[in-house]
C-alpha cells in the first residue's frame, strides 16, 4: 500500500462510516484493485463512487457542478465527494502542475469557506477558504458525486455541450460512431437470440431495427447521429483533442 494514492477509497470509507454501514477496509481496497477502479496513480474520476455503488448505494455523478448543487445535496443529508487539485487547496503547498489528483468529501458549505474531509491532511476535517476550494475544484471541471438517500432522488444531468462548435471534417467521425453504435447494439441483441421482425415482439425476440444501418428509418439514424454528435462535443468539452492520423 506504500505510495499508493487511495484518497478516493478513504473518502468512500468515510461515507460508509458516517452512514453507520459495515465495511472492511482491506476488502474494499482489494475490490477496487481487482476491478481496476484503483490504479497505481489513484482512482480515475469515472470510478469515483464505484465502491459505494458496489455496496448498494445510489451514486449520481456530474460535471460542471455548482456550489448550489453541493449546498442542496448537503441540505438533504446526501454525501458529496469532489475531484480537486490538492495543492491548490492549501496555501503552503507547492503547485507544480494543473491536474486533478485528489478527492475530498464536502461536509459543510458557508458563504466564505468550505469544510472538507481530506484523508491526507491533519486534522482530517479542514475549513478551506471558498476561493481556494473553487480554484482547486475547477481542475476537474467541477466534478462531484452525490450519494443519494434513495433512487427517487436521482435527476439526470447530461453535460451541456450546446456551446461547443464542431468542424465540418468531423462529420465522417460522427457518422462512423453512429453506425458503429448501431452495429454494437445489433451484435449484442443477436447474441442474445434476437432476430429481425417487422414489429417488435419481446416474447419472440423480434426487432425491426435488426437491419444494416443503411436500412434504418431516418428517425433511428438521427437518434444514433445525435448520440455520436453529443459524444464528440463531450470529448471536446472535457478538454480532449481529436486528431486524425494520416494513413
Segments the model singles out, each with a brief description of its role:
Residues 154-247:
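Alpha-helical propensity feature that highlights long, continuous alpha-helices across diverse contexts
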Residues 58, 79, 241:
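Residue-level detector of anion-binding/catalytic polar loops
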Residues 1-64, 76, 151-153:
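Cysteine-nucleophile protease catalytic domains, especially the papain-like/related folds used
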Residues 37-41, 91-93, 97-98, 107-153:
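Noncatalytic regulatory segments and standalone regulatory/sensor domains
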Residues 29, 71, 134-135, 222:
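Generic structural signal for individual residues within well-ordered alpha-helical segments
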Residues 62-119:
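Active-site-adjacent substructure of cysteine-protease-like catalytic cores
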Amino acid at each position: 500500500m506504500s505510495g499508493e494514492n487511495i484518497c478516493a477509497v478513504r473518502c468512500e470509507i468515510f461515507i460508509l462510516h458516517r452512514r453507520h454501514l459495515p465495511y472492511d477496509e482491506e476488502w474494499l481496497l482489494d475490490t477496487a484493485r481487482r476491478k481496476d477502479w484503483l490504479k497505481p496513480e489513484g482512482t480515475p474520476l469515472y470510478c469515483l463512487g464505484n465502491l459505494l455503488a458496489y455496496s448498494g448505494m445510489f451514486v449520481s455523478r456530474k460535471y460542471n457542478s455548482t456550489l448550489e448543487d453541493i449546498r442542496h445535496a448537503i441540505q438533504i443529508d446526501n454525501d458529496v465527494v469532489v475531484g480537486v487539485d490538492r495543492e491548490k487547496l492549501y496555501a503552503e503547498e507547492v503547485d507544480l502542475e494543473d491536474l486533478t489528483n485528489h478527492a475530498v468529501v464536502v461536509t459543510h458549505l458557508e458563504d466564505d469557506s468550505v469544510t472538507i474531509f481530506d484523508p491526507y491532511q491533519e486534522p482530517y476535517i479542514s475549513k478551506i477558504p471558498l476561493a481556494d476550494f473553487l480554484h482547486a475544484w475547477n481542475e476537474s471541471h467541477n466534478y462531484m458525486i452525490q450519494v443519494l438517500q434513495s433512487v427517487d432522488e436521482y435527476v439526470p444531468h447530461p453535460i451541456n455541450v450546446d456551446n461547443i462548435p464542431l468542424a465540418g471534417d468531423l462529420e465522417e467521425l460522427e457518422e462512423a460512431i453512429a453506425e458503429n453504435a448501431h452495429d454494437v447494439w445489433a451484435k449484442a441483441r443477436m447474441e442474445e437470440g434476437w432476430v429481425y421482425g417487422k414489429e417488435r415482439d419481446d416474447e419472440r425476440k423480434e426487432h425491426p431495427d435488426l437491419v444494416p444501418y443503411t436500412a434504418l428509418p431516418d428517425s433511428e439514424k438521427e437518434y444514433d447521429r445525435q448520440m455520436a454528435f453529443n459524444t464528440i462535443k463531450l470529448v471536446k468539452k472535457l478538454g480532449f483533442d481529436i486528431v486524425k492520423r494520416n494513413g
